[in-house]
Amino acid sequence: MIRRLFWQALALVLALVALFVAIAVVRVGPIDVSGLARHEPGRSAVMLEREREARDQGVPYHESRRWVPLERVSATLRRAVLVAEDDKFFTHDGLDWDEIRISAQKNLRAHRVVRGGSTITQQLAKNLWLGSARTPWRKFEELILAMRLERNLTKRRILELYLNTIEWGDGIYGVDAAARYWFGVGAGALDASQSIRLAAVIINPWRFSPVAPDERIQNRIQMIASRLRRRGAISEEEYRVALGLPPEAAAPAVDSTLLSRPDTTSRPPGESAPPPAEPEPVAPESTAVDSLGATG
């Protein structure tokens, strides 16, 4: 009896999944993904959604967005975003199955969504075409569009689209608009600390501020900065600045003339001066490998 109920329940679940997939395929079918290889997108689903929300609430809506080519975006910002949002971006096919599995397990244990498993490609699909709508088939739409994006566009183009359409505050879209709004500089002039702060707030740009980070964002800043330093993408000094730590104390300067002066110390007759000390061996400087160099 129990076994029969199990198989009946499984059959029902599979039937529902098949139905949702079919609905998703039909709904996203008309979307032109390949055209994004040649031109920039218009206003995204998220932009239109925010405008509707403002209109419904009777509040003014302002939109700031500036398109900037990927090569004109700070390399540290690119790397920080990848570390924060999708560390396997250049190796997956649009879906990170390990992350999906881990997120599903954590969410089931917590009985709520505590961790997302979306890749940058999935986030781009959501931002451009789906918005925040909650339907049983929306996740399938996102998965299908992500796979289509990966088939039709290069990784660099996907990253460029993502950085130019992502939301970074109320009415602020794209990295250049965000850099100018929060820090008064263009996307190419962002320093390491600014880049890390912008990457840290992507999880909820409406709630969190890159210039006044709370404890959760401070923890994310530390995580991103630590990974970038470990991979040689930022220096020790940049790491300390990003975390608000004081600079390391410099070694006291040594007067080089003292090293060459003769020893005039008074000694008993017959006692010779001690031999000069052997110089300390100098360790060879290590070369850091930039594991995110593909985005540089």
PLM features: what roles do these ranges have?
Residues M1-G296:
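Juxtamembrane regions of bacterial inner-membrane/periplasmic proteins
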